[in-house]
Amino acid sequence: MAVGKNKRISKGKKGGKKKAADPFSKKDWYDIKAPSVFQVKNVGKTLVSRTQGTKIASEGLKHRVFEISLADLQGDEDNAFRKIRLRAEDVQGKNVLTNFYGMDFTTDKLRSLVRKWQTLIEAHVDVKTTDNYTLRMFCIGFTKRRSNQVKRTCYAQSSQIRQIRRKMREIMVNQATSCDLKELVRKFIPEMIGKEIEKATSSIYPLQNVFIRKVKILKSPKFDLGKLMEVHGDYSEDVGTKVESPADETVVEGTPEIVGA
C-alpha cells in the first residue's frame, strides 16, 4: 500500500519555539524621594529601562509624575481623601528627587460633601508664588444653617454668593503670593486657607467644609538643583555614606593543595 502524505499532520516549524525573555531583566528599580515638607520621605519605587547606548535611564525618569495619597505621605489616615502629585526633577544614584506638582480630592470625598438644602460655592484663581511658580487654585465651600435657625434649608442669595466668591479669591491670592511653593504646600496640608475663608465669610453667610480642592501647576521656573536640594532639606546626608575598609585587615592566601601528590 502506497504511503501518501497526510496533510492533516502539521509539520513542526524550523528552529523551534523562541524562549520569551524576562522584560524585568533589563530594568532597574529607583527609590522615589518626597520633599521634606512631608513626614515620609521614601514613598515608593519606580521602574525604568537600563541605560543602553544613547538612551539614558535618568532621562527617562525625569518629569515622570507620581500620584500619592497624603495619608501615605503624612502617616495619617485622616488625610486619605487628598491626592498629591509629585514630579521627578532629578536623579541622584538610585534616588529620584521629586517636587510638588499638584493636588486633588478623591471622587468619593467630593461626592460626600454635596448634599441637599445647601448652596455649593466654587471659585478659582491663578496665582504666582515668590519663587515664580504659577498655580491655579480651586476652592469649594458649602453654606450651613445658623445656630438659631428653624428653617430646614440654608440657601444663599446670588449677591451673597458673589461676595463670598470675591472673598475666596482675595484670600487665595494673598496667601499664595506672599510665600514660596514649599511654604504654600505647608498651608495646604492642615487646610489653613480653607479655615481662614470660613472665618472671613462668616459675616456674609456661615460656611462649612471649605477646602482648596484642587491645585494645578501651570508654569514652573527654570530647573535649579540648589533650590531642589533646599526643598529636600537634609536629604544629602543619606544619599551615600563613604565606607572605609579597615587598614589592619590583610588577606592571607592559602597555599594551593596538590591533589594526588
UniProtKB/Swiss-Prot annotation:
It is found in: Cytoplasm. Component of the small ribosomal subunit. Mature ribosomes consist of a small (40S) and a large (60S) subunit. The 40S subunit contains about 33 different proteins and 1 molecule of RNA (18S). The 60S subunit contains about 49 different proteins and 3 molecules of RNA (25S, 5.8S and 5S). One of its GO terms (molecular function) is structural constituent of ribosome. PANTHER family: 40S RIBOSOMAL PROTEIN S3A. Signal peptide: none annotated. Its main location: cytoplasm. PROSITE patterns: RIBOSOMAL_S3AE. Residues 1-22 are annotated as: Disordered. It comes from the Eukaryota. This is Small ribosomal subunit protein eS1. Keywords: Cytoplasm, Ribonucleoprotein, Ribosomal protein.
